[in-house]
Regions:
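Transmembrane helical cores of multi-pass secondary ion antiporters/exchangers
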Residues: 1-415
């Protein structure tokens, strides 16, 4: 496709999406299905107007997916409602840790015993497919800072945290393949990748979020009443936190999410203390002011990346192994890991059941795959993991995209 054709395609999609927002909101399918259909139509599966090669363009796709995930994590973090309590966060933390590890193990076992992959590749594939996606799962996430729905809160928190908690397993898989130094008996992996990278990321994010919240509050309410550009502040916070984490070998995804959470929570606390009788939303806050712009960027990145996904697939990309892996992940690995991981958390069984199904895979999985390729994954293995991951993500868009709205509507009617 020429640049003019790309401008026409993206421009037309933006116009249609903008004009049919209400219609699509009421329809039983998600916007990602529409974008995927367009990508499949113009890609090699149908009209063959373009083909996006994820192996040759792995560096570009890594950068695009990285930015998309960062924006989505920030948007999710600043929508976290209420004050932080351990009881409220217990289930999401268990989903992002215990359930994550169980999913990686189950997928790795399937990959080794059924797909005949080496152990390192199996663990890597499990880490790629285990995280739920913050970009494509917006329909099951918190809609605004005042949304108190427990299911949405749980799924949003999980997606915010598990894009960082999956990284140690990615590095473990690369290490077992000889592409990363795990240290003697895995000591470096435990100390650096598991402990330091996780704790350091959370600390960096929380400190940065609190600092920006207090600085913005002080400047806005000082004697000179400074006008702040909230969009720039939000993007700046993402950039500084992520860049600092890359420099000190901490997980930047985790840090950005917790920076956004800390920013939102601190601003709310300052507002309640200084102006306890103010109406919610009446005070200018960095977290709220930057949210609308980030959500628009999130929608745009979703459109572009899902179209590219459709442009990667050929008709012969659909193998029994890839379809079987998808069904195993959706029907066995995710439900089992959620039910076992949240055992004893106090979360109602209905919410655990829906969380077990709403494990949307998407842009985050593509990022981890491209990250592994950029770290020296052998080409034959890279091609095999590309084919498996693309089919899993595509099936997730189709299966979850057609079931999420009807199931959520049924859940709310019975609540």
């Amino acid at each position: 496709m020429t640049s003019a054709q790309w401008f026409l395609l993206i421009g037309a999609l933006l116009l249609v999406r903008g004009l049919t927002a209400t219609l699509l909101e009421r329809s039983p399918v998600t916007s990602a299905i529409v974008y995927l259909g367009v990508g499949l139509l113009v890609g090699p599966s149908a009209l063959n107007l373009f083909h996006f090669n994820p192996l040759k363009e792995s560096a570009l796709l890594e950068a695009l997916t990285e930015v998309a995930v960062l924006i989505s994590l920030f948007s999710a973090g600043v929508k976290m409602p209420g004050t932080f309590t351990f009881a409220r966060w217990r289930a999401p933390v268990l989903l992002a840790t215990a359930s994550m590890a169980l999913t990686v193990g189950l997928v790795a076992a399937f990959a080794v015993w059924v797909l005949d992959l080496p152990l390192g590749a199996g663990i890597l594939l499990g880490a790629i497919l285990a995280p739920t996606d913050p970009v494509l799962a917006t329909d099951v996430q918190i809609r605004h800072p005042g949304d108190r729905d427990q299911l949405r809160f749980t799924l949003t928190c999980e997606a915010g945290m598990n894009d960082g908690s999956a990284f140690p397993f990615v590095m473990l898989g690369l290490g077992l393949l000889g592409l990363h130094n795990l240290g003697d008996w895995g000591t470096r992996w435990v100390v650096v990748e598991v402990l330091w990278a996780t704790v350091g990321a959370i600390a960096i994010g929380v400190v940065a979020g609190i600092a920006l919240a207090r600085l913005g509050w002080m400047l806005r309410r000082g004697p000179k009443h400074h006008v702040l550009l909230d969009d720039f502040l939000g993007l700046g916070l993402i950039g500084v936190v992520y860049g600092l984490c890359v420099m000190v070998d901490a997980w930047g995804f985790l840090a950005v999410f917790f920076a956004a959470v800390a920013l939102r929570q601190t601003e709310q606390k300052l507002a309640r203390t200084a102006l306890p009788h103010a109406e919610p939303g009446s005070l200018p806050l960095v977290s709220e002011g930057s949210l609308v712009f980030k959500e628009h960027l999130e929608r745009l990145s979703e459109m572009v990346l899902v179209i590219l996904l459709g442009g990667t697939l050929f008709l012969n990309s659909w193998s029994w192994g890839a379809v079987g892996l998808s069904l195993f992940l959706f029907l066995v690995a995710r439900p089992v890991s959620v039910m076992l991981g949240t055992w004893g958390s106090g979360t109602p069984l209905r919410i655990r059941g829906l969380a077990a199904w709403f494990g949307v895979r998407g842009v985050g999985s593509l990022y981890y795959l491209m990250y592994a390729i950029q770290h020296g994954l052998p080409e034959p293995l890279a091609l095999q993991l590309i084919q498996l991951t693309l089919i899993v993500v595509t099936m997730s868009i189709l299966v979850h995209g057609t079931s999420v709205k009807p199931l959520l509507a049924l859940f709310w009617r019975r609540s």
